[in-house]
């Protein structure tokens, strides 16, 4: 397993290099930037600022300079916020991690449990109810679902706060602060779970339906094993093999998918500043966040490969 992980780590290096070049090239060739979009600047001042930030240099030189900065942990300087991009992301990225990780735990738990039960009772009222609920939740646009949840739980019922991370002017600490953040976290997490759990439930259901019809499941039952052991130890582990592949897309998908959710609920995360930077054409911030998503994609696929090799030792042998 150690050699398998080491080989996978070495394979990620050229992918990271290629991803950094593509990201830089896309933003470098995008028309306009923060300086060009500022109509208050004179042509001379705009040229001076481009020289200061190195935007007047050849494309390859700019990429090599940016790559050198990346290797030193420097993502550049935000033109809009006037602070280093790494410092800016560090202020907001952990709030996004909190939102994404809580949503991930909930919708994987719900998706696995509901998908397994639905597969064990195909054609039942529960299976039909799950199918209707899944397709209904997946059919809602993200912004509309978020606004609907705000209308129901915040405006009409007054159960949960509308948005933000804490109450305005709050100076709570300790458990009071934790409970306050949890209350503000509930609605965005609920929105992400409703949007993401449906597809996972369908994948788990389809995979479990295929596995429970296989010969080794009938053999396990014929040996007199308890149904719980057959399902959890034999069927579920094999059904999870194709689902593990989804994990590689879940990490970046949660952050990119939460951009609209963070904006609607005014959650102070990286997705929130990403939209603001997009409107201001603050390319250093956009490049840093996009590179972060690329790294998450590669790390997610690496994690999926490791989990796949752990679940199916034949993968390690073939590799």
Please annotate each region the language model reported.
Residues 2-4, 13, 90-126, 142, ...:
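Alpha-helical transmembrane segments of integral membrane proteins
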Residues 16-25, 135-152, 247-250:
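Hydrophobic alpha-helical membrane-insertion segments
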Residues 30, 137-140, 255:
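Transmembrane helix irregularities
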Residues 56-112:
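An internal, D/E-rich "acidic patch" concept
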């Amino acid at each position: 397993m150690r050699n398998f992980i080491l080989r996978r780590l070495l394979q990620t290096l050229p992918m990271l290099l290629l991803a950094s070049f593509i990201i830089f090239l896309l933003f470098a060739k995008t028309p306009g930037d923060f300086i060009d979009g500022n109509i208050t600047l004179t042509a001379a001042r705009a040229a001076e600022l481009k020289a200061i930030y190195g935007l007047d240099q050849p494309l390859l030189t700019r990429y090599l300079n940016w790559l050198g900065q990346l290797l030193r942990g420097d993502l550049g300087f935000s033109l809009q916020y006037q602070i280093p991009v790494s410092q800016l992301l560090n202020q907001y990225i952990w709030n996004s991690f909190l939102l994404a990780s809580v949503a991930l735990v909930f919708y994987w738990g719900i998706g696995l449990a509901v998908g397994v039960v639905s597969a064990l009772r195909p054609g039942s009222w529960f299976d039909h109810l799950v199918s209707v609920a899944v397709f209904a939740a997946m059919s809602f646009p993200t912004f509309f679902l978020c606004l609907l949840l705000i209308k129901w739980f915040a405006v009409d019922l007054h159960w949960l706060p509308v948005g933000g991370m804490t109450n305005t002017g709050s100076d709570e600490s300790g458990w009071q602060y934790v409970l306050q953040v949890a209350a503000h976290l509930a609605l965005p997490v609920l929105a992400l779970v409703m949007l993401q759990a449906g597809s996972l439930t369908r994948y788990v259901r389809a995979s479990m339906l295929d596995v429970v019809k296989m010969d080794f499941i009938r053999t396990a039952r014929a040996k007199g094993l308890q149904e719980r052991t057959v399902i959890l130890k034999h069927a579920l582990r094999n059904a999870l093999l194709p689902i593990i592949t989804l994990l590689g897309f879940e990490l970046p998908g949660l952050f990119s998918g939460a951009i609209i959710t963070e904006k609607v609920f005014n959650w102070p995360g990286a997705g929130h500043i990403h939209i603001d930077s997009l409107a201001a054409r603050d390319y250093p911030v956009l490049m840093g966040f996009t590179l972060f998503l690329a790294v998450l994609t590669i790390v997610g696929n690496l994690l999926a490969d490791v989990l796949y090799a752990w679940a199916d030792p034949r993968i390690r042998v073939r590799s």
